[in-house]
Amino acid sequence: MKYEIQGEPMPVVICDLESGEPMITEKGSMVWMSPNMEMETSAGGLGKAFGRMFSGESIFQNIYTPRGGPGMIAFASTFPGSIRAVQIDPSHPIVVQKSAFLASEAGVELSVFFQKKIGGGFFGGEGFIMQKLSGHGTAFLEIDGHAVEYNLAPGQSIVVDTGNLAMMDATCSLEVRAVKGVKNMIFGGEGIFNTVVTGPGRVVLQTMPLTAFAGAIASMLPYKQ
């Protein structure tokens, strides 16, 4: 596969494929393709389908394969931001926000990732259930807003508002913690829970998660009873 990412802040990734070379994507990500692309919808097995449903994703995934020669297919972001290509291999799985996966080569496997410490997880918003990408191949991630990357040393931590965590290496650990102090919770305006990511590993943060954008817009709309 060869690919090119174009057009921030509303990006698209255009993939050129060899005949018979499949790609997988979530429902609704394809925006254009060559006529010889064949689509097949698959749940990928009961366990994987249940996991995607539990994480809030579509049960089904679409598999696109060029037939009779090379093909082309394009996948677009659903929100202003960027598309990031990440290389996955068996020794380098990653964990991503459940809405971040856009498309990948067929060798990439998706599964549900749970925090080991779930004390505040049920209330921590988007960070409780995430997706793990493993296997082998290139995956394309959808980043809301601008992407900022940090490389954490072993034991080094960063505190993140939960929705702003877009991706981390699977070597990192994740914990949702309540904000200290009742006054801070009530009057701080920063939410009740934060996510603490601890290295070693890479962390990619996003500056404008969709939930924050939707909340800002909703606060400006006239209230109707």
Report each predicted region and the residues it spans:
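Composition-driven recognition of glycine/serine/threonine/acidic- and proline-rich low-complexity segments
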Residues: 1-225
